[in-house]
């Protein structure tokens, strides 16, 4: 009989009783699937028997992020560009392993605290010293404020996805878009615990982006890297820039850039048509966050440490 061991609730720090299950233990894809729960906190534990492999799942997905960061999160998730994925995106936002939750908390804090531009500059992602105005931020293709520029960018992104014959219900939604107006645009592909995706060279999606103007990349080398999400974002950021400076950033843990994963990423990068106005950059979480944590509120520093973004 499968035995799921007892755990400690990450919120109230009280025990969650272990469970013996008759038969095969189901995979938990939402709170209601969890056989071990802290009902008062609304936190369930995935049905992994190995304590080290457990993912905690919140009944209310917003419970997975600090109270101070929750304003606007539901609205942004509801506007994510990939319509078909919205429901599962919101549900997975409540997982302790959620990449989207990390993306929201980090970038909204940097924006709301007025540190977004400075953090990008200190991470070496912005070189333009004349750039001073607060940029426009979109997460998952959704504007995070009511400004007209965000809606304009979202509308243009929809047009580009349609022109590439993407499914209207499954448009590409870059993790992060930072628009600097006449100074250019930046896409950020965020990785938390996972590596970059690995698609085979015969994957059906490649032809959609392979011949997109104005790209002059070595597409066969791009395909051999398997970095499909990055390739799609490179195509879209170049098209969205419309002659302005364009930057694609791969943001993640430092291990993303070493070993076999790093070699695969380097294969992708060397196949791109980069120049002074079309850049690819790598950034570790520590590059983005370390400089500003000394003055950060306690809730934000704790979140970054608990999620392993910084040591």
Give the label of every model feature segment.
Residues 197-251:
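Acidic, metal/cofactor-coordinating or nucleic-acid-engaging core segments within structured domains
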Residues 178-187, 195, 238-244:
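Active-site beta-strand-loop-beta-strand hairpin of nuclease catalytic cores
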Residues 107, 118-119, 198-200, 257-267:
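A short acidic (Asp/Glu
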Residues 1, 231-311:
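Non-catalytic C-terminal interaction segments of nucleic acid-processing enzymes
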Residues 98-102, 169, 222-230:
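Phosphate/oxyanion-binding active-site loops and adjacent basic polyanion-contact surfaces
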Residues 1-142:
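Nuclease-adjacent, charged terminal/linker segments that flank catalytic cores
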Residues 20-23, 129-183:
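Active-site metal-binding core of divalent-cation-utilizing nuclease and nuclease-like domains
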Residues 42, 108-110, 178-182, 191-194, ...:
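Short, flexible loop/turn elements at secondary-structure junctions
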């Amino acid at each position: 009989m499968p035995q799921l061991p007892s755990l400690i609730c990450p919120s109230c720090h009280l025990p969650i009783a272990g469970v013996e299950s008759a038969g095969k233990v189901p995979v938990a894809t939402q709170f209601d699937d969890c056989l071990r729960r802290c009902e008062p906190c609304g936190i369930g534990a995935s049905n992994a028997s190995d304590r080290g492999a457990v993912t905690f799942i919140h009944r209310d997905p917003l419970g997975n992020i600090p109270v101070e960061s929750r304003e606007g999160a539901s609205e942004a998730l509801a506007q994510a560009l990939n319509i078909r994925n919205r429901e599962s995106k919101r549900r997975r936002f409540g997982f302790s392993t959620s990449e989207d939750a990390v993306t929201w908390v980090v970038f909204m804090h940097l924006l709301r605290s007025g540190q977004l531009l400075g953090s990008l500059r200190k991470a070496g992602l912005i070189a333009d010293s004349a750039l001073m105005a607060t940029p426009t931020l979109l997460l998952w293709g959704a504007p995070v404020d009511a400004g007209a520029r965000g809606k304009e960018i979202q509308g243009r992104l929809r047009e580009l996805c349609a022109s590439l014959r993407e499914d209207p219900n499954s448009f590409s939604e870059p993790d992060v878009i930072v628009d600097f107006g006449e100074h250019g645009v930046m896409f950020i592909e965020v990785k938390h615990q996972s590596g970059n995706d690995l698609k085979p060279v015969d994957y059906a999606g490649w032809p959609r982006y392979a011949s997109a103007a104005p790209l002059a990349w070595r597409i066969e080398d791009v395909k051999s890297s398997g970095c499909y999400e990055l390739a799609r974002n490179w195509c879209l950021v170049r098209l969205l820039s419309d002659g302005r400076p364009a930057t694609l950033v791969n943001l993640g843990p430092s291990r993303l850039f070493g070993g076999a994963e790093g070699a695969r990423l380097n294969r992708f990068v060397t196949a791109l048509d980069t120049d002074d106005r079309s850049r690819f950059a790598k950034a570790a979480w520590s590059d983005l966050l370390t400089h500003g944590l000394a003055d950060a509120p306690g809730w934000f520093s704790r979140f970054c440490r608990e999620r392993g973004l910084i040591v």
